[in-house]
Structure formats: C-alpha cells, structure tokens
C-alpha cells in the first residue's frame, strides 16, 4: 500500500476516534517505528498525548482528551467503534465529569471492567465489578455508566454523602437519569445509613432532602410510581 493511502487510512480511523490513534493501530496500518518518529517530529502529522496514543495535529482537540487516551490504552488494537463494555466503561468520578455532574474532582481516570486488568499508570484506576447493559450508555463517543450507577459506585467507595446528593439532583434535573432508577441503585446501601434494608426510596429521599432541591416531592412521586410498577410486575 502506498504511503499516501496508509496516511489517508489512518486519518479515517482518527476521524472516528476524536483525532486519536494508538501505536498498535498505526503499526497495523504498516507504519514502522522509524516512520512513526518522522510523523511525530516537529512539523509532523502526529503528536504523542499518552504512552502509545497519538493525536492528529490538524484535528480539533476533543473534550476529556486525557480520559479518551486512557480509554484507548485499555484495548489498543481495537478501534473505538468495535468496543464493548468488556473493554472498559468510564465510571465513578470520571463518569460524573463527562456528564458534568456534582463537584468531585476527577483526578484519576476511572474505568469499570468485568475482569481484572493491570495498569502501570498511577492516574488510572480499574474497578472490577459486574456491569449490566442497562447501567451504561454511549455518551460523547465513550461508554459511560449511567448516573444512577455512578451514585451507587461512589457510595461503595464511601464518598462524601453531600457530594453524592448533589450529583443525584444534578442528574435528575435535566433527566440524565430517573428518580426510580436511583431508588433501585441506592437500595443496597440503605442499611448503612440507618434505614430499612433495601429501602432505596427512603435513601433517595434522604439524599434529595440533603440537596434541598425544590422538585424533591415531585421526584419522589415518580420514584414511588416506578417502585410500585416494578413490584406489580414481579408478583
């Protein structure tokens, strides 16, 4: 394949990955180490943004650049559009940052995987927990846990309850997630807060009261209706 064709193919891949490419993808296209050095030299086509991840200089800089690069590192052979939750889902504080929920700083890149995986990066944290399909969505091209799952994950990590309360209200207000879904995800944590075991409604009320949002009563009505529907469907 001619060099011009190779570069064109790389640009096509990068277009679907926010202007980013992994070293593995570059090598699979037929570009060796020497050619890659030329491409990343001053005035070249690429710049290195993380170990084994490069950005096409002419492409717009994407939001959450470092998070996207860290996610690509998890499965460097696979293009973004072929990945599933098995290759890692953005979660915890990182997921909250993608939605712009709450105020917890995303000082590490956090991902949830079903199987253990090692990373040498100190700023990357891998959580090994089961993740159901309904607990994550595609957001801005990334697989990201839903806010109801984020809240539950943060509670498992013993995050500040006030921070979780703010995140919940921030998510329900623009309908990023639903009161009933939060009631479901909070249920396993109720006993730790002195409430009846499995009472996700009571814990949701506790968090919403803490947030002070004026829509609390309406949201609780929605959550109760959801819980009632679920109960009828399972009896």
Regions found by a protein language model. Give the residues of each.
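Short gly/ser-rich loop at a beta-strand->alpha-helix junction or flexible surface loop bordering the NTP-binding
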Residues: 2-9, 15-146, 153, 157-235
């Amino acid at each position: 394949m001619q060099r011009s064709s190779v570069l064109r193919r790389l640009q096509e891949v990068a277009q679907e990955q926010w202007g980013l490419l992994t070293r593995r993808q570059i090598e699979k296209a037929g570009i060796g180490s020497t050619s890659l050095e030329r491409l990343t030299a001053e005035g070249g086509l690429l710049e290195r943004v993380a170990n084994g991840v490069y950005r096409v200089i002419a492409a717009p800089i994407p939001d959450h650049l470092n998070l996207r690069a860290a996610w690509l590192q998890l499965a460097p052979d696979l293009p973004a559009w072929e990945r599933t939750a098995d290759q890692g889902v953005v979660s915890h504080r990182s997921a909250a940052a993608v939605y712009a929920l709450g105020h917890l700083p995303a000082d590490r890149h956090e991902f949830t995987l079903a199987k253990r995986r090692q990373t040498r990066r100190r700023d990357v944290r891998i959580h090994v927990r089961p993740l159901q399909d309904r607990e994550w969505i595609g957001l801005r091209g990334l697989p990201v846990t839903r806010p109801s799952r984020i809240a539950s994950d943060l509670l498992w990590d013993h995050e500040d309850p006030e921070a979780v309360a703010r995140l919940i209200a921030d998510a329900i207000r623009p309908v990023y997630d639903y009161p009933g879904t939060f009631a479901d995800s909070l249920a396993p944590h109720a006993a730790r807060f002195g409430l009846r075991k499995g009472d996700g409604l009571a814990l949701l009320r506790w968090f919403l009261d803490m947030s002070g949002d004026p829509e609390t009563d309406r949201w609780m009505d929605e959550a109760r209706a959801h819980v009632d529907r679920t109960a009828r469907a399972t009896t």
